[in-house]
Amino acid sequence: MEKALKKWFPVFVLPTLAAFCVGFIWPFIQGIYLSFCQFITVDNAKWIGVTNYVRALTDETFGDSFVFTVAFAIVSTLLINGIAFAIALALTKEMKGTNIFRTVFFMPNLIGGIVLGYIWQILINCVLSNLAQPLLALNSTAGFWGIIILMCWQQIGYMMIIYVAGLQNVPPDLLEAAAIDGANAIQTLIKVKLPMLMSSFTICLFLTITNSFKLFDQNLALTSGEPAHATEMLALNIYNTFYSRAGAQWKGIGQAKAVIFFILVVVISLSQLYATRSKEVQA
């Protein structure tokens, strides 16, 4: 059996590997090369060195988008994981209808980001108009919290499922031992459940942080970066630089921003994984 698997292994792997190289590796390498070029199309790319990176890093809109994205990532990560964990704790108690509640909370995750963006744009603008407040296109504060609400509504159910699975995998023996030792519910949560859930926290934090930094379609549909790029996140800023600005130089600058963005997300994600996985070892 093992000989047969080894014999036919390349046959099954090569198509997937070829598709991965053609669809990801080669475009990624080409994208890095183009970030050092001035171009309109790939065929007329002209090497100009690090000029695109200098212009990208000195672009005020890129810096403002970075600050906005970091603030959004921090707030959304804390809210999503805090609320999802609280709901998971409630749904792992002995109560009727828990499966129905899990399904209802998870359903928003199945809706596309563009659709959600337009739905929430209508809802939030209706609320703002009733309160005699400026609409999203003229209200950066409402735009920020609108994206936060949208992201939480979409992601909480997914993270809740991960936390529920983690809570259900806590060994009953540990809970019984804690009860025998006289630990109350809060002590059991802090001393027993949380250490056993570090792997779940690692996954959920990784997903929420990366999703927050990569957010594009919801941002495009809900605010489009208005007013005056005040609610423009990094992904949308890169898109607007590449497609919405006139001039051949902006293509290369947009590509340089994309490479910087990729490095930023990788560094932050790996740092978070290292920090939380070290807690798993201690646990």
Language model segments and positions:
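A structural signal for multi-pass alpha-helical bundles of membrane permease subunits
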Residues: 2-283
